[in-house]
Amino acid sequence: MGFRIGKNLLFNLRKAPGSRVKARKTMVSVTMATSEWIQFFKEAGIPPGPAVNYAVMFVDNRIQKSMLLDLNKEIMNELGVTVVGDIIAILKHAKVVHRQDMCKAATESVPCNPSPLQGELRRGASSAASRMIANSLNHDSPPHTPTRRSDNSTSKISVTVSNKMAAKSAKAAALAHREEESLVVPTKRRRVTAEMEGKYIIHMPKGTTPRTRKILEQQQAAKGLHRTSVFDRLGAESKADTTTGTKPTGVFSRLGATPEMDEDLAWDSDNDSSSSSVLQYAGVLKKLGRGPTKASAQPALTVKAKAASSATSTATTPKLRRLALPSRPGLQKKPDSLPKVSILQRLGKAAVVSEAQDSQVTSTKSKSSAEVKFAIKRTLVGPRGSSSSESLGAQMDHAGTVSVFKRLGQRTF
């Protein structure tokens, strides 16, 4: 391609001899541009043969150094660069060259002017002291050297050195940028572990404000703490005494008896309970289905009747004794077989009495002149115990004439 361009230029010079100067200038610029592009591709790492071809293509398509950042894969394919590795290397080197050109333009645009202080001192150097200060400043400051513009030849020679310097400057700029970012970022506080800090002190709300009271109520509802005592649920300050008193709960104590009577009753009840053969009231008209009772030391009921005649008193006493109450059902076992007992054996030997007195018993309310008086001696068996004399007196008062068989009950076989 380069030889064709040269032949075309020579052919044009022969045809137009008046334009030789212009052709020479264009040829010099083309050759310089081609050499620059060849050096560019060599620095990018492309072999010499493809580098010359790429340089000629860039010159033919009038690619300038200021267009390096506009290059991309599609444009490189249109220019004839199809190797992927060459495309990547050219694009990377294009960025580096663009940075170098920008740095050169920045350094050339800022000239090194002398300090304005020295000019002012020189202008106002009227006295000896001012002249001495100005001379000392001139001796201390280095002489100002004018900047020289680098030629194309020197730039070609120092391309590799400038590339290295540009890489170093880019690294330095990156480090400076990182340092600035680190300065901007706020410093993180060092974490303090629980062992270094110590135990936490948590102050719970005391319920002085409505909000804290509400929070405490919610916590208690969440925990589900239920009061286990009735007194806690009722709000009592102290529990009442649930133990019963040691006072006696007898009938006389509940009726308001005197302490002396209570002591007597307690002593009688102790004596009665100590005896093993205490008889209980079983009722006159009930069936006698149990065995014979034991004779008691102290009978539960003693009845003395006084009548007008001595015969009546001797007759009523054994009958009432024979009708004494049976003993407790749990104190003795029932016999296996009960013998048949006749009525006369159960009644015992009867005294010589009148027939009227054997067959009937008169009440105190009757019209007869005989008066029957009962002297009752009770023993306190228990709260459930009932007096047999009361039932007997009631029966004798209200019932007119009661036979012995009715009072003895039915016969047991």
Curated annotation (Swiss-Prot):
Keywords: Isopeptide bond, Phosphoprotein, Ubl conjugation
Residue stretches of biased makeup (Low complexity): 302-318
Region (Disordered): 108-158, 232-257, 290-336
Chain residue numbers at which the record places covalent cross-link Glycyl lysine isopeptide (Lys-Gly) (interchain with G-Cter in SUMO2): 239
InterPro entries attached to this UniProt entry: C19orf47-like, C19orf47_SAM, DUF5577, SAM/pointed_sf
Biased composition (Polar residues): 127-139
Signal peptide (UniProt feature, chain positions): none
Residue list for modification Phosphoserine: 115, 141, 269, 296, 342
Protein name: Uncharacterized protein C19orf47 homolog
UniProt organism field: Mus musculus
